[in-house]
Amino acid sequence: MTGFRVGVGDGIPAARPAAETMTRANYLGAVANRVDSFWVPDHLNQLFPRSLWKQKYCGATKLIPRVDAVMEPWTMLGHIAARNRAGRLRLGVAVTDSGRRNPAVTAQAAATLHLLTRGRAILGIGPGEREGNEPYGVDWSKPVARFEEAMATIRALWDSGGELVNRDSPFFPLRKAIFDLPPYRGKWPEIWIAAHGPRMLRAAGRYADAYFPSFAHLPTEYAQRLDSVRSAASDVGRDPMAILPAVQMFVVTGSTRDDVDEALDSELLRAFGLNASDDVFTRHGGRHPMGAGFSGAQDLLPHDMDEQTALSHVAVIPPGVTREFLLNGTSDEVIQQAAQWRDCVRYMVLVNVSFLQRNLRKGLMSVKPFNKIVRELKKL
């Protein structure tokens, strides 16, 4: 069996000295490491408290002055494709939002990138998170139902052959709608779906080319969910084994175990654990600071937490939550952790979040062990 297929993700923050400085560096690193794909997120703000984005908590504030200054993903991928002729990596959004983005616009953006890159676009998509919808006036009462209708709309437009489309929908009704962009050589972008709950898993089985969750879960849980996705695919007449098992993982690494433990103890990386569900907290003998049964990233609203509130939440996060939530360790240790996923995952997208620590130099030096991890996973 060959090793993992590997992609690399970047948070697309507006950095210094130029807005794309960090993203370009990460892209060129991905090319040098000969990965398969490069990914960017779709957020209007970050998923940890902005009140902690201070130099005393994170050295990277010198390079990224505004943590919630997140750039737009489709624009960034177009910029990357135009500027970087080397490498010809596949380009994906991990993942776009079916809430605040009208599916017709998403269908157009993905199809456009696919044409301009000669077939290299991937449409990663999920229901989104509360933080990117509710504050901006998007109803958050039925995110999964909205997602299902968004996927049906995208498929209806892509399959229309340029003919007028009429479709009833409680969210996205189509009335004599036209979509005339062609596929690239007869193929639309692959659809990679982030799903966790039973209804979303069924939707992934119906629509996904790849099952692509993120955030905290165990390999055994992933395998069970993948079985649900493939069962749902079979129920609608699709080949269940044609669905690629993929996952996005966040990595904290360093030259030594002590450096990694120092990073994991930093306030921002511990705050990242707020994105874990209460189930993860329970496994480690705790309770989520937002309350019993809290879902984690999907319902987290971190950007209005003041500093003291954020620190009080961080203080009660069991260390095991962050360590389960993140691949962490020296390069060899992370490779060993990733190997635990080999029986259920064939494609791993890695995002280096080691810079979210107090020591800027050590955060930047994490690039070397991260690059080793990426290269070795392809052989695993």
UniProtKB/Swiss-Prot annotation:
The keyword Ribosomal protein does not apply. Belongs to the mer family. Phthiodiolone/phenolphthiodiolone dimycocerosates ketoreductase subfamily. SUPFAM superfamilies: Bacterial luciferase-like. Signal peptide: none annotated. Keywords: Lipid biosynthesis, Lipid metabolism, Oxidoreductase. This is Phthiodiolone/phenolphthiodiolone dimycocerosates ketoreductase. Its EC number is 1.2.-.-. Catalyzes the reduction of the keto moiety of phthiodiolone dimycocerosates (DIM B) and glycosylated phenolphthiodiolone dimycocerosates to form the intermediate compounds phthiotriol and glycosylated phenolphthiotriol dimycocerosates during phthiocerol dimycocerosates (DIM A) and glycosylated phenolphthiocerol dimycocerosates (PGL) biosynthesis. The keyword Cell membrane does not apply. CDD domains: Tetrahydromethanopterin_reductase. One of its GO terms (biological process) is lipid metabolic process. PANTHER family: 5,10-METHYLENETETRAHYDROMETHANOPTERIN REDUCTASE, PTHR43244. It is an enzyme of class 1 (oxidoreductase). GO terms for molecular function: oxidoreductase activity, acting on paired donors, with incorporation or reduction of molecular oxygen. InterPro entries: F420-G6PD/mer, Luciferase-like_dom, Luciferase-like_sf.
